[in-house]
Amino acid sequence: MAARVIDGKAVAAALRAEVAARAATLPYAPGLAVVLVGEDPASQVYVRNKERAAKAAGFASETIRLPASASQAELLALIARLNHDPAVDGILVQLPLPAGIDPQAVIRAIDPAKDVDGFHPDNVAALALGTPFLVPCTPRGVMKLLAAAGIAPRGARALVLGRSNIVGRPMAALLLAADATVTIAHSRTRDLAAECRRAEILIAAVGRAEMVRGDWVSPGATVIDVGINRTAAGGLVGDVAYAEAAAVAGAITPVPGGVGPMTIACLLENTLIAAAARR
């Protein structure tokens, strides 16, 4: 039997509509400032998508573009200005940054109360301690997809493939908080396929095209594919070999149309949360 497809576009559309409705009840428009340094084509696409989504939700959205030649000091000065701007509730600096700018220094410079990416050490610590405030958008989106699909992590064996600070580590923390039994696997894990086969919930976030094959998936497991990889032909594939995995899994997210739309929807929700907490 083919796996049930978890439609991230539909879940994201519902969340965006909910955020817009909640924002409309406020006496102010939540303010989101997006900073783009340089002219990376993929980053420009992401920023345009975020800007459109924010405006559609009724937010006051501002995109600030700096040249690739901008110094770290210039970027930090801009962040300091945004930190003190009462009309700005959320600040997002689009990654990756040009060479010569330390991304960790930039992340640390953002006011944690406006850190809608959830990357500031204060927000990372709050998540690890079980008292989350602003949570990284992609892991937050994955948890919402699981909930929408009626898949409860409590008591389940969950494996997160990937240990990045952006997805893997916060994903594991959220699953642990939801009472899953969590394993983090990575490039140094022995017998990776066997570890994946033990999982009832398998979340792939490693950035390698179609790395997870069908025989890595336990029959009936839920497979969440966070990866977005461009093929030589210009198409998009995830970290999971979709057709193979879909023949075995109980439920699966597609690429595109799975986790991706949830990331932007959760960015809007984080901005709304930040605005409500500040004003």
Curated annotation (Swiss-Prot):
GO molecular function annotations of the record: methenyltetrahydrofolate cyclohydrolase activity; methylenetetrahydrofolate dehydrogenase (NADP+) activity
Assembly: Homodimer.
UniProt pathway annotation: One-carbon metabolism; tetrahydrofolate interconversion
Gene this chain is encoded by: folD
Protein family: Belongs to the tetrahydrofolate dehydrogenase/cyclohydrolase family.
Record keywords, A-Z: Amino-acid biosynthesis, Histidine biosynthesis, Hydrolase, Methionine biosynthesis, Multifunctional enzyme, NADP, One-carbon metabolism, Oxidoreductase, Purine biosynthesis
Biological processes annotated in GO: L-histidine biosynthetic process; methionine biosynthetic process; purine nucleotide biosynthetic process; tetrahydrofolate interconversion
Chemical reaction(s) catalysed: (6R)-5,10-methylene-5,6,7,8-tetrahydrofolate + NADP(+) = (6R)-5,10-methenyltetrahydrofolate + NADPH; (6R)-5,10-methenyltetrahydrofolate + H2O = (6R)-10-formyltetrahydrofolate + H(+)
EC number from the UniProt entry: 1.5.1.5, 3.5.4.9
Record's function text: Catalyzes the oxidation of 5,10-methylenetetrahydrofolate to 5,10-methenyltetrahydrofolate and then the hydrolysis of 5,10-methenyltetrahydrofolate to 10-formyltetrahydrofolate.
SUPFAM superfamilies: Aminoacid dehydrogenase-like, N-terminal domain, NAD(P)-binding Rossmann-fold domains
Protein name: Bifunctional protein FolD
Binding site for NADP(+): G162, R163, S164, S187, I228
Organism: Acidiphilium cryptum (strain JF-5)
Highest taxon above the source species: Bacteria
Gene Ontology cellular component terms for the protein in this record: cytosol
Keyword NADP assigned: yes
PANTHER family named in the record: C-1-TETRAHYDROFOLATE SYNTHASE, CYTOPLASMIC (PTHR48099:SF5), C-1-TETRAHYDROFOLATE SYNTHASE, CYTOPLASMIC-RELATED (PTHR48099)
Cell wall biogenesis/degradation found in the keyword field: no
Matches recorded under InterPro entries: Aminoacid_DH-like_N_sf (IPR046346), NAD(P)-bd_dom_sf (IPR036291), THF_DH/CycHdrlase (IPR000672), THF_DH/CycHdrlase_cat_dom (IPR020630), THF_DH/CycHdrlase_CS (IPR020867), THF_DH/CycHdrlase_NAD-bd_dom (IPR020631)
